[in-house]
Amino acid sequence: MSFDHRKYRPVAVIDKPDRRWPNQRIEKAPLWAAVDLRDGNQALIKPMSVAQKRRFFQMLVELGFKEIEVGFPSASQIDFDFCRALIEEDLVPDDVHIQVLTQAREDLIARTFDSLKGAKNAIVHIYNATSPTFREQVFNVDKAGCKAIAVRAAEWVKENAAKQPDTHWSFQYSPETFSATETDFAIEVIDAVNAVWRPDQGQRVIINLPATVEVSTPNVFADQVEMVHDNIQYRDDVIISVHTHDDRGCGVAAAEMAVMAGADRVEGTLLGNGERTGNMDLVTAGMNLYSQGIDPGIDFSRMKEIVALVEEITDIQTHPRHPYAGDLVFSAFSGSHQDAIRKCLARYQEGDIWTAAYLPIDPADVGRRYEEVVRINSQSGKGGVAHVLERDFGIDLPRWLQQELAGVVQGDAEEDGGEITSERVHRRFNSDYLNVPMGWVLRSYDLNRSNEQVQAQISIGDDRQPVTLLSGRGDGAMSALVDALNRRIGGEVKVVSFDEYSLGDNTEANAMACVRVQVGDSTQSAVAMAVDTTAAALQAILSAVGRMQETSEQLIANS
């Protein structure tokens, strides 16, 4: 049996009845650290060149990141050269810390400090794996030996930093595989490292807690972080950071809960690039805060540009459903969704609190157009069809006509099996409702009122058909035309639905009329636009009757 759950065991959970983090709220953004140029880079099939790293670094600076991990200079000549270029060409703003990673070896730590000579602000990040799997199966050391590795590395970092006093140094330590480590042992190692670095004496220290591999639900990780927060020495003098991965799909949630549990800093990558299933996505985490009215401190307003550069350099395409950044995340195909969105957008005024249905943020905030929101396919309904006509062409239809047109468009979508553009919806609207049948163009009308009755003289025709004069009487212009049509075609013409609208000033016509006409058991709808409401109403009735006549003639011809 190859698919056998019995080969696994559940992760151990912490007995922590005094947990406080579930009642906490995130009220400000954590300190963000972008690790795209190191952790993200090492996961690429084709790692970045120095030129690509420079472009990526510049984008991170422009977005507002203040701590940027730039490489692993002791392990890569490209990373070493990149560090030197950043420093020697003065590419690092004064308020930005560059961060580098090194293993806990004396020669590699010395090489790392060589790469940082002349830096204004730098973070040296050391790590060693502390979980039972690594202690017992990979390195064959006991707990004491594991702790000794971390302490020696901390001493080497302190010694090398003292040789370069002009740099403002930050020291960072990660008990790698923290999420799979006994939490009390992780605290023991952290305290031993802090005893060397003495953050209480002014040294800036970051204690980074990695979910190197995500092994539990986010609440378990939050318990672990809160336990560290509550029990490490020098807590008020150190920055607790977290570094989550997405092996179980909860990297962002784990980081958010960790902040609730006391973390001050979060590491991640743009769009979540990283080993295996990726690092925590800084875009999602930042925009989650933004959607709650919290300034993330990072400018994601040019989302398409961010996505384009990340895709170009990493050669990884962004999923169309990726939160906040994917092509389809602000698109609605479902009819009920479209109807709700349309109504909410119609009510929204600049300056209002955003509460639109199905849109957690205003798409315009990240550079997206409202034109992308409602899109039409076979799942769309009247709301979506009405929305694209109103949005793109300024045409506002009555509900009964929305339903009718939606059925027509849905048939087209089912036949094609794909998306229907707004231009195609408009063409369908024109051909089925707005275009005037041959010979049924309103040429002129004359209305005379006498004894509460209107006598109408209406001429119809076009360049291809001779002009026909219609005469009728009624309570108003429309009823007079209906009377005239009944006399001409010998049927019982009834207007069963009618709506009229004024059009914007930027159109040739000033009025639009929508009608549904019934003759016997048949109905036909039509729309007309004209310079005044009377002309629009008369033309709409003429078009509807004309279409019925065309249909009857076609049926007779085909029988």
UniProtKB/Swiss-Prot annotation:
- Alphabetical UniProt keywords: Amino-acid biosynthesis, Branched-chain amino acid biosynthesis, Cytoplasm, Leucine biosynthesis, Magnesium, Metal-binding, Transferase
PROSITE patterns recorded: AIPM_HOMOCIT_SYNTH_1, AIPM_HOMOCIT_SYNTH_2, PYR_CT
Q: Please state where this protein is localized.
A: Cytoplasm
Per the database entry, which stretches of residues form a coiled coil? none
- Quaternary state and interactors: Homodimer.
Tell me the HAMAP family matching this sequence.
Answer: LeuA_type2
Function field:
Catalyzes the condensation of the acetyl group of acetyl-CoA with 3-methyl-2-oxobutanoate (2-ketoisovalerate) to form 3-carboxy-3-hydroxy-4-methylpentanoate (2-isopropylmalate).
Q: Which family does it belong to?
A: Belongs to the alpha-IPM synthase/homocitrate synthase family. LeuA type 2 subfamily.
Q: What is this protein called?
A: 2-isopropylmalate synthase
